[in-house]
Structure formats: C-alpha cells, structure tokens
Amino acid sequence: MALKIRLARGGSKKRPYYHVVLADARSPRDGRFLENLGSWNPMLAKDDEKRVQLNAERIKHWIEHGAQPTDRVLRFLDEAGVAKREVKNNPVKAKPGKRAQERAAEKAQKVADAAAAAADAAE
C-alpha cells in the first residue's frame, strides 16, 4: 500500500482548514485516512504558532516506514526541521517562450535598422 502524508480539506466555504493525514495514495482527498498527524489553518497569521501544528514523532515514524509527503506537507516539515526539502532550481523557467523571443529579436532588428537609417541621414 502506497502511503502519502498529505492535506485533507475541512472547514466551510471560503474558510479553509486542513488536516495533515496519513492516507493511502489511492483514496480520495477528503476520504479515509489511517492517522491524523497535524493541522494547517491558512486563515491565521503567518507568524502564529497555531497556524501549522505537526506531530513530528509520528511523522518521522511513518517516513521511516516509507510514507511519502506531498510537496506542500514537505514544505511544512522542512520549516519544522523534521525532513529536508530539496531546493528546486530551474533556470530555464525564467526565459520567455519561443514566440516572445522571436518578437523581441524582430523588435531589436527594427530598432537597429532605424538607428542605422538615422545615422545615414545625419551624414
């Protein structure tokens, strides 16, 4: 059974509240879970100590037994010092797309042509 440590949504409409749960990867998001491992209340201030509450001992136990935390839960665990999250580096992401690069090249060519024409006219 593939186990995941993930978020299960609770709360009402526009007032989210999440439980950090251990669940089978195939079960629904808010469906059956094996153990409740903590909570996250995004409505609280970021510096509030009750915003993220984790049972670190049980989380370590389940990670040792093969449970995989989701990306968001892994961020919480990294902040709490329970697990290490690898920093993702994608330098290609910042580059514009192919069409945008073509348009920029065309625009630069037009500017260069206009500058050359102005220089010829000035002579």
UniProtKB/Swiss-Prot annotation:
A GO BP annotation: translation
Compositional bias per record (Low complexity), positions renumbered to this chain: 111-123
Keyword field: Ribonucleoprotein, Ribosomal protein
Region of interest (Disordered), ranges: 87-123
Coiled-coil region(s): none
GO molecular function: structural constituent of ribosome
Cellular component annotations (GO), alphabetically ordered: cytoplasm; small ribosomal subunit
Basic and acidic residues bias: start-end ranges: 99-110
PANTHER family, A to Z: 30S RIBOSOMAL PROTEIN S16, SMALL RIBOSOMAL SUBUNIT PROTEIN BS16M
Entry's family note: Belongs to the bacterial ribosomal protein bS16 family.
Protein name: Small ribosomal subunit protein bS16
